[in-house]
């Protein structure tokens, strides 16, 4: 039998399949990419056992657990574990702390199905701690550069052309603005942290010690940036991406109208998908109504409604350009101009897509001497 392991680094670097024996509620609050939840106890059973533990102690709780998970219930769960183990002979199982639940699952697999399957020592809690430490270690040991720029300049597009980028919006499944929600919701905070940490771990293992990330506020939708990373982002050098207003409008039209509408249609079907997309767009504008002011909000909402009606009627999207351009000129550009002014002392380079890409791939010697360019 393969030995139990506490080599968390290798588990995540190799995307090792993992069988999570925690209850569904625990799993839904946060897990690891690729982990499969095949619980020893369901939520109701776990609640009963937990109450018994508090009232009558560990031995009584264990006895109740064996009583609740017995007969056909036990057989079905062992069969599911056995199927997983056969499909993933290189995998491991775990519970919350690497204690009784994973040990019992191990024993049942061996005794009932004849399969010896290793567990993760320390379980979910230890792996979660390892990933959080991975982020803090990177902040302390690596260099970081912040990619800034006006809305629609294509910062995310550029990041995806770099091997050493950390795409925070990708991990958060949110574009980082009032209009940033996708058709499908965001991961939990724990899942966001875990995905980011594994990304960092793999890139450091590939030899990267300098990372580029997009300028973000502390929260990307419902996901908050790790505290030490966000604090560092207030000090890291900034590279500023520039583009024409026309290109920016085209890019926003692509991301927030064409692609977003397609997402909703894929998830909900043509008719309901378009209705939900239109409602999301209107709600996003409503979210900034107070900052826009009542009259300006009403004007933009009217232009947006007309564009949505034209899109639904004919499939044409050009009418959206009017409210996009107005929103840039009246709201986003003044806000970003103020932010650029505040960051002016940290801006080490500014240019168009190609020049910024070249700079970030091969920063000059003077840039490497700055904090963030080790």
From Swiss-Prot:
Enzyme category, top tier: transferase
Catalytic activity, reaction form: 5-methylaminomethyl-2-thiouridine(34) in tRNA + selenophosphate + (2E)-geranyl diphosphate + H2O + H(+) = 5-methylaminomethyl-2-selenouridine(34) in tRNA + (2E)-thiogeraniol + phosphate + diphosphate; 5-methylaminomethyl-2-thiouridine(34) in tRNA + (2E)-geranyl diphosphate = 5-methylaminomethyl-S-(2E)-geranyl-thiouridine(34) in tRNA + diphosphate; 5-methylaminomethyl-S-(2E)-geranyl-thiouridine(34) in tRNA + selenophosphate + H(+) = 5-methylaminomethyl-2-(Se-phospho)selenouridine(34) in tRNA + (2E)-thiogeraniol; 5-methylaminomethyl-2-(Se-phospho)selenouridine(34) in tRNA + H2O = 5-methylaminomethyl-2-selenouridine(34) in tRNA + phosphate
Residue span, Rhodanese domain: 12-136
InterPro entries: P-loop_NTPase, Rhodanese-like_dom, Rhodanese-like_dom_sf, SelU
Protein's GO biological process: tRNA wobble uridine modification
EC number: 2.9.1.3
CDD domains per record: RHOD_YbbB
Gene3D superfamilies linked to this entry: Rhodanese-like domain (3.40.250.10)
Keywords of this entry: Selenium, Transferase
Active site positions, chain numbering: 95
GO molecular function annotation: transferase activity, transferring alkyl or aryl (other than methyl) groups; tRNA 2-selenouridine synthase activity
Family, similarity comment: Belongs to the SelU family.
Cited function: Involved in the post-transcriptional modification of the uridine at the wobble position (U34) of tRNA(Lys), tRNA(Glu) and tRNA(Gln). Catalyzes the conversion of 2-thiouridine (S2U-RNA) to 2-selenouridine (Se2U-RNA). Acts in a two-step process involving geranylation of 2-thiouridine (S2U) to S-geranyl-2-thiouridine (geS2U) and subsequent selenation of the latter derivative to 2-selenouridine (Se2U) in the tRNA chain.
Subunit text: Monomer.
Protein name (database record): tRNA 2-selenouridine synthase
């Amino acid at each position: 039998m393969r030995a139990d392991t506490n080599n968390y680094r290798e588990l995540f670097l190799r995307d090792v399949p993992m069988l999570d024996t925690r209850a569904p509620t625990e799993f839904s609050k946060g897990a690891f990419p690729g982990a499969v939840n095949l619980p020893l106890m369901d939520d109701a059973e776990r609640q009963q056992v937990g109450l018994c533990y508090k009232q009558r102690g560990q031995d009584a709780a264990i006895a109740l657990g064996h009583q609740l998970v017995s007969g056909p219930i036990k057989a079905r769960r062992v069969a599911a574990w056995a199927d997983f183990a056969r499909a993933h002979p290189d995998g491991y199982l775990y519970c919350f702390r690497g204690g009784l639940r994973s040990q019992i699952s191990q024993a049942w697999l061996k005794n009932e199905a004849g399969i010896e399957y290793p567990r993760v020592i320390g379980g979910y809690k230890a792996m979660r701690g390892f990933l959080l430490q991975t982020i803090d270690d990177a902040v302390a040991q690596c260099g970081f550069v912040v990619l800034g720029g006006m809305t629609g300049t294509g910062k995310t597009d550029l990041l995806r052309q770099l091997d050493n980028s950390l795409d925070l919006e990708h991990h958060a499944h949110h574009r980082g603005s009032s209009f940033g929600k996708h058709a499908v919701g965001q991961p939990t905070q724990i899942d966001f942290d875990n995905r980011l940490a594994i990304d960092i771990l793999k890139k450091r293992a590939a030899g990267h010690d300098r990372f580029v990330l997009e300028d973000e506020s502390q929260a990307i939708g419902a996901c908050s940036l790790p505290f030490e990373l966000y604090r560092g982002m207030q000090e890291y050098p900034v590279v500023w991406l520039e583009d024409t207003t026309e290109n920016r409008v085209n890019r926003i039209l692509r991301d927030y109208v064409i692609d977003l509408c397609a997402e909703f249609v894929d998830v909900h079907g043509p008719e309901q998908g378009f209705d939900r997309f239109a409602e999301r767009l209107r709600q996003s504008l409503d979210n900034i109504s107070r900052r826009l002011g009542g009259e300006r909000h009403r004007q933009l909402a009217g232009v947006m409604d007309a564009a949505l009606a034209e899109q639904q009627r004919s499939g044409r999207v050009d009418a959206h350009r009017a409210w996009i351009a107005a929103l840039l000129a009246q709201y986003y550009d003044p806000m970003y101009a103020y932010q650029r002014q505040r960051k002016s002392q940290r801006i080490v380079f500014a240019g168009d897509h190609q020049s910024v890409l070249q700079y970030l791939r091969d920063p000059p010697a003077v840039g490497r001497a700055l904090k963030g360019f080790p």
